[in-house]
């Protein structure tokens, strides 16, 4: 990780998972994420689903967007089962973002998610700048409005 005055550059999937975990743990109201489906498997493996469940048990809300396809049905079903609101965007890949309580965020440049592993190199940016979080949330909300509910998509498989 490289520390910068206004944020931190994240250089590995391992560090990105740690940062995302910290954002979820510190959130009190809402977490919103837009993530390629292969990253959901890694996130679950490293207990992000459990941390999300704790937030929801405390009254928080989690909304997420991914591309639902057969290899990732179980990962999405688990998120829906624990209470996350998940929507589908066909053929989504590339960047990821996670925003907690409209102030902390991590976002990436393009990621080749199918080939990703814990030690893979990435370029992502963490910041606690609320203006940047609002910018990311504006993108999230636009995609959210166009996305299809996961329950509907899951019922088609």
Please annotate each region the language model reported.
Residues 2, 32, 64, 144, ...:
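Residue-level signal for secondary-structure boundary elements
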Residues 1-19:
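N-terminal localization/anchoring segments of enzymes in phospholipid and broader phosphate metabolism
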Residues 135-157:
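Cysteine/selenocysteine-centered motifs that mediate thiol-based redox chemistry or coordinate metal-sulfur cofactors
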Residues 16-81:
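Primarily the HKD phosphodiesterase
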Residues 84-132, 140:
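HKD (HxKxxxxD) catalytic microenvironment of the phospholipase D
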Residues 11, 33-36, 65-68, 89-90, ...:
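Short His-Asn-centered micro-motif
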């Amino acid at each position: 990780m490289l520390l910068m005055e206004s944020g931190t550059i994240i250089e590995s999937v391992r560090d990105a998972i740690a940062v995302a975990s910290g954002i979820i743990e510190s959130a009190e109201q809402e977490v919103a994420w837009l993530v390629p489906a292969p990253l959901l498997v890694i996130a679950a493996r490293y207990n992000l689903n459990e941390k999300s469940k704790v937030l929801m048990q405390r009254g928080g809300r989690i909304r997420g967007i991914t591309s639902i396809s057969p290899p990732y049905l179980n990962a999405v079903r688990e998120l829906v089962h624990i209470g996350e609101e998940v929507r589908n965007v066909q053929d989504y890949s590339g960047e990821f973002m996670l925003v907690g309580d409209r102030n902390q965020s991590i976002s990436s440049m393009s990621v080749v998610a199918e080939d990703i592993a814990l030690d893979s190199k990435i370029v992502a940016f963490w910041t606690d700048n609320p203006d940047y979080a609002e910018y990311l949330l504006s993108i999230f909300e636009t995609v959210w409005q166009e996305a299809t509910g996961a329950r509907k998509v899951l019922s088609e498989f």
